Each structure stands twice: as structure tokens, then as C-alpha cells.
Amino acid sequence: MRWFLVLLLVALVSVEASRRSRLFKKLYQKASNYDAAPSNVQTVWYKNMKLDHFTWGDTRTFDMRVMWNNTFYKPGGPIFFYTGNEGGLESFVTATGMMFDLAPMFNASIIFAEHRFYGQTQPFGNQSYASLANVGYLTSEQALADYAELLTELKRDNNQFKMTFPAATQVISFGGSYGGMLSAWFRQKYPHIVKGAWAGSAPLIYMNGGGVDPGAFDHITSRTYIDNGCNRFILANAWNATLNLSSTDAGRQWLNNNTVFKLDPRTKIRNQTDGWNLNAYLREAIEYMAMVDYPYPTGFLEPLPAWPVTVACGYMNANGTSFSDKDLVKAVANAANIYYNYNRDPNFTYCIDFSICGDQGTGGLGGDELGWPWQECSEIIMAMCASGGSNDVFWNECGKDIYQTLQQGCVSIFKSMGWTPKNWNIDAVKTLYGYDLSGSSNLILTQGHLDPWSGGGYKVDQNNAARGIYVLEIPGSAHHLDLRQPNTCDPNTVTNARFQIIQILKCWVDPNCNTIPTISPLPSISIPNGDCKDVVGGYPWGQTTGATVSNSFILAILASLYAMF
């Protein structure tokens, strides 16, 4: 769910522009060879996918990329279907190891479908983002219809793939971040096609009317750092320190020639506006490390050590409040270097003007970098901002009307296409999918306690649980860690959550399972020590159903005793 992630496409020429650009937090993650989960996928193409599923007057089509692995599939087994999100499929294949780990147990086929307008699935080729008329077909609703058509085709005799799944084949959808949102909505919109959904770190209610505080993301980011030993004063005051230094000749001289970081020659500090640019650059690293605070080395966004927030706090944990401006900036910059330059490349430079260099924090996204901003400027409109003070360690950027500020950002990005506020629907998600789960069933919604995006997810509700809607907030877990390949360094909470989820999946695909599974509270967190290694085919990872039942039994006894007194 990226996150999160910030895609800063507008030059930060003022404080207000900085606020606008930071509103586009992109959930996409870029994988690397650090995240090489076992996959062995084959690429195939769905030919002649409908461009517009909701009219009979438009017969245009495009080709959609699909990756699959049928090594473990046996007739009668389910389809594990990944609802592709805002990026190329490769990232999601390598970062969703649980699907591959479970497939042999379930005799499952693994299918990843690429989201229209992302990766290699470009309906209009290199003109996909050339006009509003073209990019207007980039919607979650159209993408879900793509997935529904693909699965329908796969169950059709003599289909274009020359591989037919029985009509009774159960489909379980998987997804993380925006992909998790799609996975949950897929089950809600197409329950006749999808038996159930595992949606990891999906901010399903972070839109208008969902009841989420706009400051939730940065509140949780700040909590993750403070809980890991960071001195709140250092983080909260470093931003003004940057501005103070950028306001004087001596301060600018130091910022441009210090020994902690090198600035790109094109983006030297010349004024306080450049100081804001530096703040945005440093903050991006702080936020992203909270998202990907994994217990082992990864390369999900950039190459990072295990528990990167803990490592970062090693530079920001000095006691007290008596720090010079230079001390504060050095502390946060050293922390940011863990994200941007963990491999200590001596030639690495901070390019802090995103209009010149793009976003170094999520570089390599390809030619579809306008995709997520378009979706945030049309249907998936998330009001997010830091407010400082007691809420978080950043500056107050909320302003009087967060949506008006967001609109100004949309105009800046899409003005050449003629974007106006008429092109967005602030209530699109509420109208298309809704926030009330009373009519839904068979949803597994996981949230990582460390993950800033968890603030946009559902909370535990016993009424929902009675309908087979499971909400798990997992201590010690960052952005959809539960969907990644199991690892010896995973906290026991993550392992137990996976184990319980698998019992639910078993019921969903078993035609003889007529009882809604229940889940138990997760155990107190314990973090393993030692070498971190992927665990392939390790289910049940030392967990037992009996232990889970026993925990529930103990809780029931305690509740009864409490009632007696």
C-alpha cells in the first residue's frame, strides 16, 4: 500500500507548492534483486481487452500483460490472482512471495494481471498519457473489469490462452497497497468471480467521507521513529534549522559544502525556497523508511538494512534540546543517507529539485509516472498532510482547505492537458465501492502497526468478523510485510497472522467448509535474532491450530471471570 509514495512532479517554488506536491503520496514500490522471491513466471498477453467496459458503442481494444506460474496447479486447485497496482508487474511478482509459497499446498495457479496504463500495458502506446481523452480510461473501475474479463476468458473453452480452468475454479485475489484496495473491491464488485480477498496494507477509507484524519500518515510515521528511540526534538526542529541556514550566506555556504551530503550542482541552495526543497527531500526518506521498516535487508524502494528506522535513529537519538542548526540538519541528513545512499557511493548527490531530476526516492518508474497523480486527480483522492505539533514531527502543511490545495497541485501537473476540477470526483470511491462493509464478506484486511498507511485502513469490528471480514493490525509489521516471502527474522506476530490467514483460505476453497472461520488475538511480539534467511515451503512455521484455539479459550475464561466480579 508505499507505502507510499511521494511522486513529486512539480517544482517546489514556494511553501505552498511544497504542500501541493507532497500531497501525491504514491503507494508504488520498486523492487530490486534484494527482493527476488521465487517466481519462475511466464509472460503472456491478453489480446483485445476492451478499452471501455461500460459502453457498447466503443469497440476499441488493447493488449494486457499477464504473468503466471502454473507449476503447482492441479485441476480442482484455485487461482491465486494478484490485482496489479500502479507499476510494472515485475515489482509485485518479486515482492509477493506468499503467493508462491502457498501455491504448492493449495495446488494453485498463480496469475498476476498488469493494471492498465502501467508497466507495459499501455492502451494507447506512447500516447497513453498524451491527453485527457486517453488517460481518462485509467480508472480503478475499468481495471477491475479488465481482471474480471481475464478470469472469465480463462474459464472459457477454447480460450486464447489454450489453457482452460474448470468453471468451478475458486479465485482468491491478493494485493498490497493500492493493489490491496483493488483486491478488496474486486471481491465486493465481482463476488461471483472472486471467492475472497487478502488485501495487505490497503488504505481503503483514506478518501473523503472515510473518517480518517488527514494527518494519520505522518502521525504514524512519527510514532514509528519515536518508538525506535529517536529524539523527537531533533526531528521536529531540523526543518526550521534547514530554513534558518538557507536564509543566510554563511548557512547556504555550509549547506552547499558540508561533509554529510553532496548537493547536485544543478540544485545548490540559493535561497529559502531551496531550503524547502531540501526539507522535502529529507522528509521523503524519513517517511519511506517507516513504510519499509522490514526486519531484514531489502531493496523494495532502495537498498536498505534490516530495521532501517532503528538504524536511522542511531543518528537522531542524542538526548536534550541544545543543538545547533547544523547539528540538527546533520542528524537528519545522516539518517536520510541510509535510505538514499546506504551503499555509500562517494559520487552520490542529492538532487533536491524534482522538476530537474525527478524523484530519486522512487526512481526508475518508467514512463507511467503520471498514472498515480492522475488517479489522485480524478477518483482516488486522498487528503493527506502533516500538521506538526503533537500530531507529528513535520511542519504544518494542512492549510485551510486541503482539497483546494490538492486541486492546485492537479492543475500544475495536468494543465497542459486542460485539467479542471470537473475532472475529479471527490466522492468516487464512496460511490463506487462504499465504506460500509455490511454487505460484504470474505475479506482479509491486514495492517502493519509500523506502516504509515495503516491509518487509512479499517479497524476491528466484531460485526464484520461475523460475516467473514477479518481485520488484523500486526505489531512489528511494516507495509504489507505479511504478503512477502516468509523469513527467519519475521516477528512472531507476522508468522502467526499468516498461519491464521491460511486457515481462512483453506475454508474458502473447500466446498465442504460451511462454518465461518474465526481468528484469535495475535501473540505478544517477539523479534528473532540471528541470520535472516528466506523460508521457502516452511508452513506451518511452528504454529499449531491447537495453540490458537487454546489462546481463544484462555481469553474466554478470563472474560467469564471478569464478568463474575
From Swiss-Prot:
SUPFAM superfamilies: alpha/beta-Hydrolases. It is an enzyme of class 3 (hydrolase). It comes from the Eukaryota. Disulfide bonds: none annotated. GO terms for molecular function: dipeptidyl-peptidase activity; serine-type exopeptidase activity. One of its GO terms (biological process) is proteolysis. The keyword Glycoprotein applies. Its EC number is 3.4.-.-. The active site is at residues 177, 451, 479. Glycans are attached at residues 69, 107, 126, 240, 244, 257, 271, 319, 347. Keywords: Glycoprotein, Hydrolase, Protease, Serine protease, Signal. Residues 1-17 form the signal peptide. PANTHER family: PROTEASE S28 PRO-X CARBOXYPEPTIDASE-RELATED (PTHR11010), SERINE PROTEASE PCP-1-RELATED (PTHR11010:SF104). Belongs to the peptidase S28 family. This is Putative serine protease pcp-1.
